[in-house]
Amino acid sequence: MKVEKLNDIKNNSKEIIFNSNSKIVFFSDCHRGDGTYKDSLAPNINIYLSAIRYYYKNKFTYIEVGDGDELWKFKDIQEIYDMNYEIYEVLEEFKEKNRLYMIYGNHDKDKSKIKFLRKNKRRNRFNHSASDFYSTLEIYESLVLVHEESKKDFFVIHGHQIDFLNNELAFLSKFLVRYVWAILEAFMGFKDPTSPAKSNNKRNLFDEKISRWAEENKTRVILGHTHKTLFPKSRNESTYFNIGCCVLPRTITAIEIERGEISLIKWTIKADEKGSLFVGRDIIGGPIRIENY
């Protein structure tokens, strides 16, 4: 898809109005898996769980910007749901409070399809199913968030739509990830050369394309897909933000909007002076007033 097609997607996006009292957190590329050797989130699962519990307790709205579930490596979404049951309990609480929005990415687009959910109706021992969770939750391609006071808008989308190999050739990339790259990466350390998350050249080209589009269209963009954080310090630098991912070594990243300010956040495992481990939250970008963009 040509980058210009983002205009059509943006124009057809659900619009959400927020204000300077709103609290919003964006996560992307969680890649929740089934707990086997191909599960990229497994090493960080307690960091992620601690983070989302913090955001629920502090009354944030949770927006997941694609690739929340890893449906390229794994076929069975119920196995993913069962492995991440504590996580889904928290997400269910967000959902019940109308504080949950999900956007699909290339790795989890299937869960937005009714046909896929109908094929996955198996239940766990608690009589809960992934199908129940997702069939009552709209999965969006994109969202537009509008700041009530400044009228600044943020176009939120996963980003694979302008990545030829992961959009038009998604069927081929999915096959290679499931049967080739996931195994080579797990056992031999190879990195998938077709993915912007694993290829610096692809990522740089992707970032340049998005930055140029955002500038030309005078809009602010929040994406995932590349797994690499981007946080411009002002409009003069860029208006393209990248959330990063939840599958970095011992680290997950997120973007927060609170009190009319936007920040880039890092969650990691830390040790105190006595050697006790805990999950810590650090601001690594911002906070910067939304009006500055």
Each model region followed by its residue ranges:
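Extended recognition/assembly regions associated with phosphoester-bond processing machinery
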Residues: 1-64, 68-293
